[in-house]
């Protein structure tokens, strides 16, 4: 069974782990990673989560396994969930934060890359129903209709702010 590392409030590894699905003990935190993949047309790759995972649209993310850092964790999640290999040197961490309520550290990544033939990607059926490219306005509309995973939309807004401030790319 998959294990996750526990950290203190300063993100120091405590030497303790929990099993996937276990509650995070008070005073401890786990790491959550996610990534927004943007193509050269300015669209973002989203995945429709499986019915058992709420069936909403979201980006790819999850929890690093015990022993993985956040970069290794996001590389693993993307490979497992949608079958894509990412170049770690191209990853940009655009946000890092801590949620007391959820007892997590967030590490959000961004990468600009084109992925051809997304209909041929090897999806993890337990987690992902399908994938698609979406414009910024389409993502905003999904959110307005309640079809976008709330936590991931908050991270999308943080990405939009970061892209605008950093002039990393043409976001329109």
Where are these regions (language model features)?
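Acidic, metal-coordinating catalytic segment for phosphate/diphosphate chemistry
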Residues: 1-34, 40
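A glycine-rich, hydrophobic loop/mini-helix early in the fold
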Residues: 32-63
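The catalytic Nudix box helix
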Residues: 46, 58-92
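Nudix hydrolase/Nudix homology domain
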Residues: 54-57, 100-104, 108, 118-172
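Active-site segment of metal-dependent pyrophosphate-handling enzymes
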Residues: 79-119
């Amino acid at each position: 069974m998959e294990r996750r590392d526990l950290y203190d409030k300063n993100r120091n590894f405590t030497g303790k782990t929990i099993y996937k699905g276990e509650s995070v003990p008070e005073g401890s935190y786990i790491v959550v990673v996610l990534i927004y993949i943007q193509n050269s047309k300015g669209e973002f790759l989203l995945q429709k989560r499986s019915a058992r995972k709420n069936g909403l649209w979201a980006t790819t993310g999850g929890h690093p396994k015990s022993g993985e850092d956040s970069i290794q964790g996001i590389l693993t999640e993307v490979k497992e969930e949608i079958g894509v290999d990412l170049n770690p040197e191209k990853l940009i961490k655009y946000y890092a934060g801590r949620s007391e309520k959820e007892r997590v550290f967030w590490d959000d990544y961004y990468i600009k890359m084109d992925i051809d033939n997304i209909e041929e990607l090897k999806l993890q059926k337990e987690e992902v129903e399908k994938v698609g490219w979406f414009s910024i306005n389409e993502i905003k509309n999904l959110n307005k209709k309640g079809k976008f995973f709330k936590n991931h939309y908050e991270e999308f807004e943080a990405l939009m702010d970061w892209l605008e401030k950093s002039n990393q790319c043409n976001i329109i």
